[in-house]
């Protein structure tokens, strides 16, 4: 969801101890559930020579319940918040689009899954998602930088808690810590 001006995504992740305490923190801070817990499967695509990755770009196909979404993300801008161009397109059939991507020379390079619950607040210009992944629980705050900073502080987090890495990068770090060979960030592959 692109909540910032134009087609720019501005966000941070925050590590949470577990889904239950993270949900309780949000609910007691005035947030309410906007979209119930939903399983997402995400597949990143690139060319055989990894042109998108080299350019700092990403092409993702997401299946989330009855919704399929194609997302392009441009190179990130360094800073305390993750900021990058984001273009999204709702698809009627992820399977058909997978075939189109294949015919165009794109191949799947990384799969990851998570359970996502979306939270919001009536007076809030931003959104918070609670992501349960095979490598841990995260809160993702998306909106304008001031809203992100104010919301993170209101939830008891400090700027040094901000994570701007992608789930792919976090997964590679997790594999290194666990002394595991990287594969895909799925429940089956992570042994979660």
State the predicted function of each range.
Residues 1-126, 161-192:
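N-terminal strand-loop-strand beta-hairpin
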Residues 146, 152-160:
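A hydrophobic, small-residue-rich beta->alpha segment in the mid-to-C-terminal subdomain
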Residues 66, 135-137:
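Beta-strand-connecting loop/turn residues
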